[in-house]
Amino acid sequence: MNNNRKIFEEVQNFVQNYDLNKDGSVTSYDIYLSFLKKMNGDVYKASQATGVLCSTIDMDHDGKFTYCEIAKYCVDKAKKQIEQNAEIAALADVEAMLLRFDKDKDKKLSQTEFLEYFKGRGYTPYSDRDQYLKIIDLDKDGCVSVNELQEWFKKRRIDYATMLSARGPNC
């Protein structure tokens, strides 16, 4: 499923959760009523939560939530989630990579082992085959360790999240 489809579905879920009168649009009043219901009639907490959510989503402060405003909120939320999970996901990526490419089982990849990763995807990463060492091999020992791989995968995930957020939704 592509990113725009996911964002569209998130927006639809948002509208379904907060559009209590089912008129197809979400206003700050809809948000307030939804929170009031979820907070068992606690006016103070509902007002507070509404204020926080509205100040986060309603960028033009008109009391209404456009598709673009809700989609931007969903993209930013997804970016934060990716960033929070980047460390754990990177470790899983590293484990999978080591299982497949660490032929001598020394828990690090030689230049040859590392380049197999890229060849398996149909390309060589750089015109200068040693350039990966300059980028990933932080301790300059000629091999890529678990920690170096984890940092590399983590950075790739965070860069991806940043790119998604910067590009934003197609409105």
Curated annotation (Swiss-Prot):
Residues 6-41, 57-80, 89-124, 130-159 form the EF-hand domain. It comes from Dictyostelium discoideum. Ca(2+) 2 binds at residues 102, 104, 106, 108, 113. InterPro entries: EF-hand-dom_pair (IPR011992), EF_Hand_1_Ca_BS (IPR018247), EF_hand_dom (IPR002048). Keywords: Calcium, Metal-binding, Repeat. It comes from the Eukaryota. GO terms for molecular function: calcium ion binding. The keyword Repeat applies. This is Calcium-binding protein F-like. Ca(2+) 3 binds at residues 137, 139, 141, 143, 148. Ca(2+) 1 binds at residues 19, 21, 23, 25, 30.
